[in-house]
Structures are given as structure tokens and as C-alpha cells.
Amino acid sequence: MASITRQAYAEMFGPTVGDRLRLADTALVIEIEKDHTIYGEEVKFGGGKVIRDGMGQSQRMAADCADTVITNAVIIDHWGIVKADIAIKNGLIAGIGKAGNPDMQPGVTIVIGPGTEIIAGEGMIVTAGGIDTHIHFICPQQIDEALTSGVTTMIGGGTGPATGTFATTVTPGPWHMERMLQAVDGYPMNIGLLGKGNASQAAPLREQIAAGAIGLKLHEDWGSTPAAIDCCLGVADETDTQVAIHTDTLNEGGFVEATVAAFKGRTIHTYHTEGAGGGHAPDIIKVCGEANVLPSSTNPTRPYTVNTLDEHLDMLMVCHHLDASIAEDIAFAESRIRRETIAAEDVLHDLGAFSMISSDSQAMGRVGEVVLRTWQTAHKMKVQRGSLPGDNARHDNFRVKRYVAKYTINPARTHGIAHVVGSVEVGKLADLVLWRPAFFGVKPSLILKGGSIASAAMGDPNASIPTPQPVHYRPMFAGQGSGVAAASLTFVSQAAQQAGVADRYGLRKRTVAVENCRSVSKRDMVHNDWQPDISVDPETYQVVADGQLLTCEPATELPMAQRYFLF
């Protein structure tokens, strides 16, 4: 039998079972768990290669073939780290397996035909498009920035650079909801908007859900009182929508116990649950142990570094309209920034108690760094805490699955969109991101929206080949013309979908209703479902979880940083 060295095989067809990859310049290493391709029957495109007429390409009609095949890719997702060919059909993931010509090859599960396009995935990593659930829609340019970082779904609120939007992720009222849904209709990004949840009467909240909001946002700047919390969650239960909350930093309406009591066991997504981004000082972090609380972080505290505290004070003054000349405003800012709880947040992520990571875009967060800071946190914890149970000296597969879930499947489940996005699984929208391993988490090579390429690192358009400098991100065809509407989704409430808001507003994108928002709980947070009993010392701010002190040192140096951004 003919043989080939492992190195030569990896160079030709990409890594296979037992091969390992380093992620960017981190300390994280993955090992391929399974290879769905067949040795000796791999497909590859190019001169003298396999995918040619009568060889790896069949004669079958387009209806029986994939529209696009990504060949020999390494998939990283919450369910596994595998090598496979990926089929895309009608904008959806149609297969994960072995591609080729079933008339010539054994074991083919994905048919390549004359109507099939090929994307070479050899040596590449494929992940699901990221989901950022904490967006202040302050400027539309955020969408391009997020897309080129590997994010394909944005959830939040706002109306542009209005004072309310600078501070809160809220698109308030039916009129603003209609205008914003119309505005985002032209962008290659899946988008869902949150209405204002701060009201003590239900009617103003119901009308926002009916207008298209996929959920409601409670924010302390609008008054996150127990009465508002109770009312908002009641409307959410009626309409099967999610509630996100930024709790009461100053403890004016009650302490954290009063807020938890107002939840009444109902599901809620707690933003920046550590507290630097806002929330009951100093112990909002305790809520991550509640079964009905779905806790997330925003990325400025990810991970804890020697610069974290200083930059937060300046950010806070701007984002929450505070005045440095007013002593009470300074005290408010300083009460939110605590090194002890930020350090504990790192550890709680590594142990799976914090379930999600998001941005807080332009409002104490960086919209293009959700993916990057997730992996920086994973690296820091690997270096400081060693391997997790389930991992070993060869690989960090479990830790990688835990962290990728924080910006893919878990936010999708939280906001009722996991039936269409959030993972690399058959039947879901083909929102896929391709990475060279050396640039993983930092700079993707291709971003697919609904099976079409929406953005890519592209060279000089006037060059004779695609690679000459300057190479930078450029919009591709899925972000142009009518292709935008075909490749992306607008998420709305079930009530809005039934009322036909898409036609009423003149939307071109397909609208999809959120579902199962009220039945989701902490136990549904994949690899991130730990519910510790947490206490915070009111004087030292030390965090103890199930009797264990949680702390770590700030990082003085991180991977995925300067060496990737010289130009």
C-alpha cells in the first residue's frame, strides 16, 4: 500500500486525526478528534487535482449536489474538533462529511457536480459566525467592524449617536423600532433589536414587542427597579422573548437580593455580570450561580491585565454621562471598578460559570474584539491555571470547546435563535468563518453569510492575482445589492412575525421569529453551566465560590496583540 508521511499529508490535505494545531500565538493547542474524509479518496481542487470532470466531480444535476463545498477543513465547535468537508445548499449547511463523486468514490455523503463551487479548506479552521449580544447601535460602521472580526449576528439596541444609545442598548418605542429595522436591512449581518424594558406598566412594553423587538433591555440609567424588573419579565413570559438587564449599581432600588427576588425564578440574561460594566456594587457577580440567570461578560474586562482598571475609569465617565468635577459621579465610577471581582471573572469563565462574552460596542466595549478577547482569556487561564479536567499535556480541546461556546451556541440559545444560527450543524444558516491557524481569532480569511462570501482579506483589485498588497478587508458580493437580503436575517418577535411587520416596514431580508426564550436556563449553557454559591466580601471584594477563593494575577503580556496589528 502506498503511504505518505504525516507532515506531507497535512501539507497537502490538512491535518488529520492525532495531528495538533496551535491557535494563533497562544498556548492553546487542539488535536483533531475525528476525520470524516477517507484516506486516498480526499478531494482537492486545482490543476492536476481531484475535483475534475469524471473524477471527484460527478455529472449530477445541481438539485442533487452541493452549491458550495469547503474541502478538508478543521471544524472547531462546541460539539467537537473534527476534519471534514462541509456542504452548503440554498444558503444552509447541508452536510458535514465526505465530498466527492459517488459514481467513482466510496463513502461519499456530499455530492460535487458541475454546479458546485469549491472553497479550499486545507489547513484552515472553520467556526460558526460569532454572535454579539451586547450591541449599542451608535454608528452603522460597527457592523463592518464586527463582520470582519468573525461576528455574523448582532443583538442589541439603539438609534445612532443619541445620548440614550451611548449608555443603553435600547431601541425605544415602535417608531424607532421601525426606523432601525429599515436601516439595518441593507447590511450583511443578522440583527435583532431590543426594546426598552424599564416600565412598571405592561402596555408600553407589549407594543415594542409587537413592533419587532426580539426582547427587552432593563438598564439602571432608565431605572432598573424591582417593579420594572417584575413587569418586564411578565411581558417576556407572555411573548416568549428574552430580557437583558444592567442592574442597579448604586443599590438605590434595593440590593442584589432584591433584584434576584424580583426575577422570581424567571429566565434573564445578565449583562457584564462581574459589574465593571454596571450592576449592583460590589456583588452583582453572585447572580451567576442562579439557575435562571444566563450570565455574560463584556470584553473590556477580558482578560484581566495590568491596564484594565485605569482604562475603565475613563471609559465609564464618558459612557454614562458623568462629570469629573462632581464628587458623587467620581464615587459612582470608582464603585464599579474592582480588581478582585475582575480577577474572579477570569476564573469563573474558565470554570464555566460565566456562559457568554459580548462587546458593549462603543459603550465600554470594542465591537471587533469579542472573538479575540475570548481566546486571550482562554490563553491566560491556560497559562495561569494549567489544563482543565478532560484535557491533557497534548491538547486543550475541552477548554477550546468551552470558550467557543461563549460567543456561538450559548448566546444563540439565550436569545432564541439557536434553531437557525450559533453552530456548525446541518440545517443551520451557513454563517461560517475561515481562519488560517496562525491568525485564528484575530484576522479571518473569509466570512460567509448565508453560504455566500460577505467579506474577505483581499489584495489590490487591480493586481494580476488576488494577493498583492495592500491586503485588507473588503466587502464581497454577499454584501452587495440584493445579495444582502438573500444572505442575512432580521430577527423579530413571534408577535411581530405574525403581524407581518416585514411587509409593513418594507423589509427585504427574511425575518425569523425568536423562540424558546423563556424555557432556556443555565443548564442549557453548553460547557458553561456551573452554578456556584458565590459570596463577595463587602470590604475586601474577595470572591469565594463554593468555599474556594477565586483570584488570579493580571496579565502583563498577551498573545493575539501587537504582532498582529503592526499595519
Swiss-Prot record:
Binding residue positions for substrate: H219
Residue ranges of domain Urease in the record: 129-567
Post-translational modification as stated in the protein's UniProt record: Carboxylation allows a single lysine to coordinate two nickel ions.
Swiss-Prot/TrEMBL keywords: Cytoplasm, Hydrolase, Metal-binding, Nickel
Gene Ontology BP terms: urea catabolic process
Names of required cofactors: Ni cation
Modified residues (N6-carboxylysine): K217
Pfam families: Amidohydro_1 (PF01979), Urease_alpha (PF00449)
Residues annotated as the enzyme's active site: H320 (proton donor)
CDD domains: Urease_alpha
GO cellular component: cytoplasm
Top-level taxon of the source organism: Bacteria
Annotated positions binding Ni(2+) 2: K217, H246, H272
Annotated positions binding Ni(2+) 1: H134, H136, K217, D360
Parts forming coiled coils: none
Biological or metabolic pathway of the protein: Nitrogen metabolism; urea degradation; CO(2) and NH(3) from urea (urease route): step 1/1
GO MF annotation list: nickel cation binding; urease activity
Co-factor note (free text): Binds 2 nickel ions per subunit.
Similarity-based family: Belongs to the metallo-dependent hydrolases superfamily. Urease alpha subunit family.
PANTHER family, A to Z: UREASE (PTHR43440:SF1)
Protein name as it appears in the record: Urease subunit alpha
Organism listed in the record: Delftia acidovorans (strain DSM 14801 / SPH-1)
